Amino acid sequence: MTDLTSLSAAELAGLVARGESSAAEVTQAHLDRITAVDDRVHAFLHVDTEGALDAARAVDARRAAGEPLGPLAGVPVAVKDVLTTKGIPTTAGSRILAGWRPPYDSTIVRRLRAAGTVMLGKTNMDEFAMGSSTEYSAFGPTHNPWDLSRIPGGSGGGSAAALAAYETPLSIGSDTGGSIRQPGAVTGTVGVKPTYGGTSRYGLVAFSSSLDTPGPCARTVLDAALLHEAIGGHDPSDSTSIPAPVPDVVAAARLGASGDLAGVRLGVVREFAGEGAEPGVLAAFRAAVDTLTKLGAEVVEVSCPHFQYALPAYYLIAPSECSSNLARFDGVRFGLRVGDDGNRSLEEVMSATREAGFGPEVKRRVVLGTYALSSGYYDAYYGQAQKVRTLITRDFTTAFEQVDALVSPTTPFVAFPVGARTADPYQMYLADLFTIPSNLYGGPGISVPCGLADGLPVGLQVMAPTMADDRMYRVAAALESAVGPFTPPAL
């Protein structure tokens, strides 16, 4: 009998639609897998067993009644614990939100339910999406299924690790500086940051509002495209949502899977193809570029000179926005409250709550952001960073006048051991060196497995113009079809 957890989302949806397997059977298989391996991986913070089975049985009832099913009906999905889920704990990986059960679903979750997917639960993450290793979660680190002594990337390491451990065929993440793509790269899975505004932020616990982008994670490019199609599109509840339809990413993925890139012009980012990455990562990337050429793509070198300033600009813009966004967590309305013994002032209670509720990385970024926005320093730091952001956007605009898409390694290194970089924030921040530019620009990016280095996965990143997400899906699917899947060791 076929192991249901080994199948793609598209394959599982087909089984359910044809009646060859029930949604309940598919869901139970994945719940059993979570029970079997998640004590070692720790991808999930909360598993909604009864809710998942109820949703699966509802899909089976619809099929039995002859109702039409969507392309992902009956397929399990895991959701990063940064998106609100009605009645289900949402912590953003922080002690300050421990036990909070939101009264509403985020738009992404609402669309997942409407598509007939089955939500298994919430996945682990760096606190408030601030981190690159999922070691900054208040509830303990997640481990990489390729090597349990190593990190799964971050901030959305739980969503990526759950895929690599075959606990779910689909998951949802959020990407502020690389938090979907970087975990995808180091776990050998597919991670997508859609165009900013192409997926709704309504119900997303905010880190950096001008950068945060929810997106799909999967084991195949087609599965990611199907999930992207389900969650994308305009949402009037999000003022930054783009009033335009989702590009036809599913058709693009299917076209790319044919392995034909004739007529596609790709640019290798010169500044990201040399120094700054491990030799094994560069070797795998260069081999993948050779493969893209063999598939018919024309590959040229493109210079984006201001990309080198993206990392410092990001670490002024994002902390500045987070220092404002996180001011709402004060212990007054919801979540953790400390020191409310009747003998302290409201200000003292708020201070004690934040001291106990926020972890060290969150505190570091809030302090940095508060300083950058302070009187006398705003123009020198935040203002200058926004000017750099404009220059990076111009680099992208100029590049896309020459090529259809840009390619680079997704991350400079493979998964490193748990604990290896927590004492050095700068080394941790370098994990997002290649992914941050797309966030500052607002365009889409996808990470697709392209090879191995030292037995660990390496990802290739494809970046496209805003609202041209279909371009990157075509390129990623073509590469995937040529290099094949990369399967982690059995757990």
Swiss-Prot record:
PANTHER family: GLUTAMYL-TRNA(GLN) AMIDOTRANSFERASE SUBUNIT A, TRANSAMIDASE. It catalyses: L-glutamyl-tRNA(Gln) + L-glutamine + ATP + H2O = L-glutaminyl-tRNA(Gln) + L-glutamate + ADP + phosphate + H(+). Keywords: ATP-binding, Ligase, Nucleotide-binding, Protein biosynthesis. It comes from Salinispora arenicola (strain CNS-205). GO terms for molecular function: ATP binding; glutaminyl-tRNA synthase (glutamine-hydrolyzing) activity. The active site is at 80 (charge relay system), 155 (charge relay system), 179 (acyl-ester intermediate). The gene is gatA. The keyword Protein biosynthesis applies. Allows the formation of correctly charged Gln-tRNA(Gln) through the transamidation of misacylated Glu-tRNA(Gln) in organisms which lack glutaminyl-tRNA synthetase. The reaction takes place in the presence of glutamine and ATP through an activated gamma-phospho-Glu-tRNA(Gln). The keyword Ligase applies. This is Glutamyl-tRNA(Gln) amidotransferase subunit A. The lineage of its organism: Bacteria, Bacillati, Actinomycetota, Actinomycetes, Micromonosporales.
